[in-house]
């Protein structure tokens, strides 16, 4: 992710594509299914008021697992600008402790945001599972340094995350932190 700029037009329908190669909006579900495996067996990672998040992989690079946020335009109505803002923010950010944004697909009914899959779960769950055990002071310092580094990067890009909490910090399977949720979930 180098010098990316977003030109997301959430109000358009299928058949209209625009944007640069990295942030290009593509023609909805058909194009999405050409590049990613999406079917009735696709794992649902989560569900919110505006849609669902699915875990899948790229058909051309099966090792590239992704999370696809599928958002209903009809449920979003008054929040379409927030989606545009989230994409604009994610295209600015390139940091090892911030979720990576790959691309957007849009059709008449849905907006599909393709992002990095983070397989280790929420920091909140890691804290809750530890019951009487807490993170060591050394581990806590390492995690806080990484979180501060991500915040410093965001601030340098003019971005302020207004909802940093354990539920919005994911852990990779290798134990790395990734800050998520820059708009609507």
Task: Give the predicted meaning of each segment.
Residues 42-49, 53:
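Protein kinase glycine-rich loop
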Residues 65, 70-93:
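Conserved N-lobe beta3->alphaC-helix segment of eukaryotic protein kinase catalytic domains
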Residues 104:
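Activation-segment/catalytic-loop signature of the eukaryotic protein kinase fold
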Residues 109-122, 126:
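Conserved short submotifs of the Hanks-type protein kinase catalytic core
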Residues 124-135:
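AlphaC helix of the protein kinase catalytic domain
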Residues 143-144:
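Activation segment signature within eukaryotic-like protein kinase domains
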Residues 149-159:
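Protein kinase catalytic-loop region centered on the HRD/HxD motif
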